[in-house]
Amino acid sequence: MKYVALKDVCKINMGQSPDSSSYNENGEGIPFFQGNADFGERYPVTRVWCNAPTKIAQSEDILISVRAPIGALNYAKEKCCIGRGLAAITPDKSKVSLEFVYWFLKGKNAELKSKGTGSTFKAI
């Protein structure tokens, strides 16, 4: 078996919070997810939109919580803006499948949580 770094088979896009003046609850712009509080069983639930996104995840990207609680996962069901509490992982499908990466990360949840640092809340 050959082990490779995640960054060698996936693009990792760390979230960034857009200006709060671009947030809205009336559907203008694209869905905005700040962290795993927006996560559903498989896909996030849209409550807030953003009309000036800074970091974007594409449909079928894996969304991972990078702030407490670390490691929660969802799939992006559409193009969306991601805040500082999330990262989007885009597998290079010529190297690895989306499902493999999702379940691999799910299996590494305890290890990811153990890597968290911070006194107020854990983050990776």
Which residues are covered by each model-predicted region?
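A short beta-sheet element
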Residues: Q34-N36, Y43-K108
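Hydrophobic (often cysteine-bearing) scaffold residues that line and stabilize catalytic clefts
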Residues: K2, S97, F121
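Non-catalytic DNA-recognition/assembly elements of restriction-modification systems
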Residues: M1-S17
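Short beta-strand/loop turn elements enriched in aromatics
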Residues: P18-N36
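Specificity-determining recognition surfaces
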Residues: L105-I124
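A generic secondary-structure signal marking the coil-to-beta-strand transition
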Residues: K2, E28-P31, I62
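Generic structural signal for secondary-structure transition and capping sites
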Residues: M14-G15, D38, N109-A110
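Residues that recognize and position ribonucleotide moieties
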Residues: P31, C80, K122
